[in-house]
From Swiss-Prot:
Function, as annotated: May be involved in transcriptional regulation.
Recorded GO CC terms: nucleus
Limits of the KRAB domain: 8-79
Record's protein name: Zinc finger protein 888
Crosslink (Glycyl lysine isopeptide (Lys-Gly) (interchain with G-Cter in SUMO2)) position: 204
Domain of life: Eukaryota
UniProt zinc finger (C2H2-type) residues: 214-236, 242-264, 270-292, 298-320, 326-348, 354-376, 382-404, 410-432, 438-460, 466-488, 494-516, 522-544, 550-572, 578-600, 606-628, 634-656, 662-684, 690-712
Organism for this UniProt entry: Homo sapiens
Main location: nucleus
Pfam families listed in its UniProt record: KRAB, zf-C2H2
Similarity comment text for this entry: Belongs to the krueppel C2H2-type zinc-finger protein family.
Subcellular location as annotated: Nucleus
Keywords: DNA-binding, Isopeptide bond, Metal-binding, Nucleus, Repeat, Transcription, Transcription regulation, Ubl conjugation, Zinc, Zinc-finger
Amino acid sequence: MALPQGLLTFRDVAIEFSQEEWKCLDPAQRTLYRDVMLENYRNLVSLDISSKCMMEFSSIGKGNTEVIHTGTLQRLASHHIGECCFQEIEKDIHDFVFQWQEDETNGHEAPMTEIKELTGSTDQYDQRHAGNKPIKYQLGSSFHSHLPELHIFQPEGKIGNQLEKSINNASSVSTSQRISCRPKTHISNNYGNNFFHSSLLTQKQDVHRKEKSFQFNESGKSFNCSSLFKKHQIIHLGEKQYKCDVCGKDFNQKRYLAHHRRCHTGEKPYMCNKCGKVFNKKAYLARHYRRHTGEKPYKCNECGKTFSDKSALLVHKTIHTGEKPYKCNECGKVFNQQSNLARHHRVHTGEKPYQCKECDKVFSRKSYLERHRRIHTGEKPYKCKVCDKAFRHDSHLAQHIVIHTREKPYKCNECGKTFGENSALLVHKTIHTGEKPYKCNECGKVFNQQSNLARHHRLHTGEKPYKCKECDKVFSRKSHLERHRRIHTGEKPYKCKVCDKAFRRDSHLAQHTVIHTGEKPYKCNECGKTFVQNSSLVMHKVIHTGEKRYKCNECGKSFNHKSSLAYHHRLHTGEKPYKCNECGKVFRTQSQLACHHRLHTGEKPYKCEECDKVFNIKSHLEIHRRVHTGEKPYKCRVCDKAFGRDSYLAQHQRVHTGEKPYKCKVCDKAFKCYSHLAQHTRIHTGEKPFKCSECGKAFRAQSTLIHHQAIHGVGKLD
């Protein structure tokens, strides 16, 4: 049967772009190009699935010089030569769509099709595809980048003048200059009667008249492809027909569900050839690969900065535009990235989805968890190039580097103070503004830093996460642990520039420096007394208020200072953590150890200005001064008798109470004063520590020695 000779060409509905025009298209326009191509492709395939056809495909890689072949589809009513494998075609349509989406996500150029027409005969077809086998057209690895063009044509020798003219006209177009998205379809009028009822003819007529037959009433947007219309409709209607059977999450596209499922299966099919790292998305692999190549193809037109990811460039551009389109519904704070908004939202919800497998501690950010893990692993990836000191956090390294450079680039506009870090400047500014946005839910106390609130919260919870490996003592603050460790190591990093004396704490150095300067900047408004440190002034003020808010749980005794309660608590526990390296004697407080140490050194740094007498303990000097001033600040409430020492008052009060707390272990005799017990104990031991320098006679009590020395005419001892 002779094939009809009449032809119809669709050249007039072609959508063509030059290379320069193509680069100007935005992603949405390129996606439209893809959808039009696919619609044409499917419509042509669906014309007559039972008909015999032949197809050839190959493509050109972007920037390569491979020969371009055009896929051809031939109706051969009288030739039963091989059958088109339409399932293969549909499979490749799906592969093309998926790969396009991967490339778009990856930031690659969208696929483009370059056209070159071929004419052929059934003889040529017979030679290439003899054997009546299904055609397995070879698409190759580059099919994802280029969709082949389809032609339906009649066998050579039966083509009319119109067909030859159409082909000649088409071949005159420069394929190196044009990129075409069109079905160059040549069909006889007889076949065309059926064809005019297809969606392809409708699409051709719509494009030719610049009309769009699919319009969405919600947005007013029109489309010339039903597939585009359906996709757009899904976005507005919020329809998500693809559901994950594991977690129930819904998606509006099947490919999104396929990507999501890999989260549950752990599948990571894309592997890096360089380092072996695997990824669940091809886009992630491509992005990772740029780390090896150093490629940064995305450039900011404003400042020239380049990026390896398109998303990073888009985020960067908001710096120039100042755009922050993502707003928090809770507090109104705006962000330039949706991820930042999502992260911020956890502040309101309290969500902490990232949990440490070692200690079960939870975090609101993945970066916080990774940073925390280094505590368990001991990893310190940030190393100083000057002194090789390593740090867990990059911020800690940045702080440390300032020691070497002494650079403090961040300056406060209010007071001119400079800082090595911008975060430190921001915290400092709250001093001027008085802003304290962080409030404790337990007691209502407010803080200017979140870290201070977190630290304060441990007072309510009793949490002490920092433990000393030497003595197992625990602390609520890391700085307290580091300070405590110096007791074991003997480290004294704070050195006086005047006398080279070293100290474990910077506060102790500050106290010591006043000895040289004599400065006491902190003054009490009640009594006018001045102090070296603000903490000392705060402690002093309690004397005027009489407040004793620190109570011992063991005996109920109250104290006006927390440190005093801590010292007192050691009476119950028997703890004496401070040991003398000379004689091994242990003490409850560090000050007691320091005083004791002067017995070995003979140091007496405290001198009376009246009589030049020297003392090894400051409190002894203050007590001695009362000899000159006659001051007796401690008064008995019963008989109004006054004393120069609080210990004397305590002893005296036992006269009224009859209390004798000091008991001899040998004979059970009790005494009001500890000194009386000590003197009595020598009766049992026979010890006589007080010896006369004139005659060598020894005595149990110092008072007895003084009385004896009067015989020799020696004056009383001071």
